[in-house]
Design a protein with these regions (language model features):
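Short glycine-rich, polar/acidic loop-and-turn segments at beta strand-coil junctions
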Residues: 41, 53, 66-69, 135
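Short Gly/Thr/Asp-enriched flexible loops that form oxyanion-binding sites at enzyme active sites
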Residues: 70-82
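Catalytic core of DAGKc-family lipid kinases
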Residues: 40, 80-135
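ATP/NTP phosphate-donor binding region
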Residues: 1-62, 76, 103
């Protein structure tokens, strides 16, 4: 399975994308699995990146590296693609989604990479989808 990290440099108090890239490279140094890192450059860019990769059809785990807004954008891009798993790697200011799952290792990148995915409910509204908040 390929791993795609969509990093939002604008999430959180300061840009920590370099730190996240180094951590990703460290975790994958001894793994024989393909990965790619993409940095968002403008609003809704995470949606575009996720959709483009999901549409390829290959098994894919996408990591949303940002806050709740980034997570929502990534979800919008991969929703409906059965080949995609979505993981939240929090780096925003609120990170409300992960607060509903106390005790789970969302902040441990290696645990996310090696972890098993679970199915959760998604909310659909008008012409969009959301995981925990409607923007």
């Amino acid at each position: 399975m390929k791993h795609l990290f969509i990093i939002n440099p604008a999430a959180g108090i300061k840009d920590r994308s370099r730190q996240y890239i180094e951590e990703i490279e460290r975790v994958f140094a001894d793994l024989d699995e393909p990965y790619e890192i993409a940095l968002t450059e403008y609003p809704r860019h995470a949606t575009e990146i996720a959709r483009a990769h999901a549409a390829a059809g290959a098994p894919l785990r996408i990591y949303s590296v940002g806050g709740d807004g980034t997570l929502g954008e990534v979800l919008a891009g991969c929703y409906g693609y059965r080949n995609v798993e979505l993981a939240a790697y929090p780096s925003g200011t609120g990170n409300d989604f992960i607060k509903v799952f106390p005790g789970l290792p969302f902040g441990d990148l290696a645990a996310l990479v090696h972890g098993k995915s679970e199915t959760i409910d998604i909310l659909r509204y008008n012409d969009g989808v959301c995981i925990n908040i409607v923007n």
